[in-house]
């Protein structure tokens, strides 16, 4: 949703000539320019956190988070396998080891009851993912983390504005990371944000973002790199887009929720289809996702999705292959594994729920968002009924 607000913000930056005012030297611009600071301030107010640090991607912000919470190379970070790749590779980028723990079959988020199975003396952090906009079970996750002295990084890439028991997602763990990639609820083209109430985490994240140096405004630059850092800096143009977009977050989320509520009500009337949302969660629907039972429906998920696409409704089955089934993990290609003293295993079968979700059950609809209407949602429901009513014919065609 791009309008006059975004255009005005972008033109202001272009006319100023300050496209990126980050510098790695003493002065206020070590922390970015005018638009960066304004975007960070607005986002910290929106989430209710003390600190918000803008990055050029959520991947970069996740990497910075792993560093900032104190994970050391060779230590382990527990992540779900049913998520975008960056949740896991952010650990490998720091030469730490991702350990995969299975998800819940109903909400697709990491299952707290499985955490004990993967915990080891090397475990240092957990990254729960609020997948598709639905919150993970944060009470149980935080209790496990507290018992074992672990840090918690919330992956909120798909859940800006979401809540768990009236708490903003990203504010429950030690820090939270958001994405502003073009497909997200609000976007800057590319971009990310780390939020936290911990000053030490904020300072470390700022160092990772800007070449590993910490520049104090009242001291001379020492050119001393305290930690390994990168150029993970957001531009003024992206921040300007973010300023305009963040003011629209509530409206855009409300539109998604309105459409998804209608879809959920209708989907759950059909035996063999199911959408789950916990009552104490504010789901912000990066995508509308439901489970498919091919035995009850009478056709395979692939046939169903192909038929839905033939009706003009884009959908996808499975989301992502569980990450550990990719060659990066199966063959332990990353440098981190060469100096790792643990015994993590990556092989088919270690997270069976994630595998069955990918192979048979999950269907995604990514069109339940503004400017779609309730009439559009009814068209989807009508198409689903049409497919089920004609499943015998579809079965013949697929054989």
Model-derived features with residue positions:
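Conserved small-domain helix->loop->beta segment predominantly found in fold-type I
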Residues: 220-230, 264-327, 398-399
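Conserved PLP-binding active-site segment in aminotransferase class I/II-type PLP enzymes
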Residues: 1-68, 72, 94, 146, ...
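PLP-dependent aminotransferase-like
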Residues: 25, 67-156, 163
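Generic structural signal for small/hydrophobic residues in well-ordered secondary structure
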Residues: 10, 43, 61, 77, ...
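Conserved PLP cofactor-binding pocket of PLP-dependent enzymes
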Residues: 212-221, 262, 305-363, 395-399
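Basic phosphate/pyrophosphate-binding loop/patch that engages nucleotide-derived ligands
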Residues: 142-151, 193-211, 299, 303-313
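Active-site region of PLP-dependent enzymes
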Residues: 24, 31, 159-165, 172-287
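Structural detector of well-ordered beta-strand residues that form the stable sheet scaffold
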Residues: 53, 78, 99, 152-153, ...
């Amino acid at each position: 949703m791009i309008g006059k607000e975004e255009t005005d913000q972008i033109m202001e930056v272009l006319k100023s000539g300050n496209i990126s005012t980050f510098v790695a030297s003493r002065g206020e611009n070590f922390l970015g320019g005018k638009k960066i600071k304004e975007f960070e301030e607005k986002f910290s107010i929106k989430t209710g956190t003390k600190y918000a640090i803008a990055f050029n991607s959520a991947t970069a912000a996740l990497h910075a988070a792993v560093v900032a919470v104190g994970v050391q190379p060779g230590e382990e970070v527990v992540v779900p396998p049913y998520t975008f790749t960056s949740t896991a590779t952010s650990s490998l980028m720091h030469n730490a080891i991702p350990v995969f723990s299975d998800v819940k079959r109903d909400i697709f988020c990491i299952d707290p009851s499985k955490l004990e199975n993967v915990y080891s003396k090397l475990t240092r952090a957990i990254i729960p993912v609020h997948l598709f906009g639905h919150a993970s079970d944060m009470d149980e996750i935080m209790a496990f983390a507290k018992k074992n002295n672990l840090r918690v990084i919330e992956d909120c890439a798909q859940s800006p504005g979401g809540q768990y028991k009236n708490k903003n997602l990203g504010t429950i763990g030690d820090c939270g990371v958001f994405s502003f990639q073009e497909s997200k609820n609000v976007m800057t083209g590319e971009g990310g944000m780390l939020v936290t109430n911990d000053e030490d985490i904020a300072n470390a994240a700022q160092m990772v973002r800007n070449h590993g140096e910490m520049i104090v405004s009242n001291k001379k630059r020492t050119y001393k790199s305290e930690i390994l850092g990168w150029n993970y800096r957001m531009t003024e143009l992206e921040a300007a887009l973010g300023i305009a977009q963040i003011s629209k977050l509530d409206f855009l989320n409300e539109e998604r929720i309105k459409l998804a509520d209608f879809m959920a009500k209708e989907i759950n009337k059909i035996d063999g289809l199911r959408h789950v949302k916990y009552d104490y969660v504010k789901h912000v629907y990066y995508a509308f996702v439901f489970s498919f039972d091919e035995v009850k429906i009478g056709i395979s998920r692939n046939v169903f999705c192909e038929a839905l696409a033939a009706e003009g409704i884009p959908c996808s089955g499975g989301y992502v292959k569980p990450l550990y089934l990719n060659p990066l993990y199966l063959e332990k290609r990353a440098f981190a594994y060469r100096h790792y003293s643990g015994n993590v295993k990556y092989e088919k079968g270690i997270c069976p729920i994630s595998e069955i979700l990918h192979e048979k059950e999950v269907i995604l609809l990514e069109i339940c968002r503004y400017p779609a209407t309730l009439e559009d949602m009814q068209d989807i429901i009508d198409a689903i009924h049409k497919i089920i009513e004609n499943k015998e014919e579809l079965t013949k065609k697929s054989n």
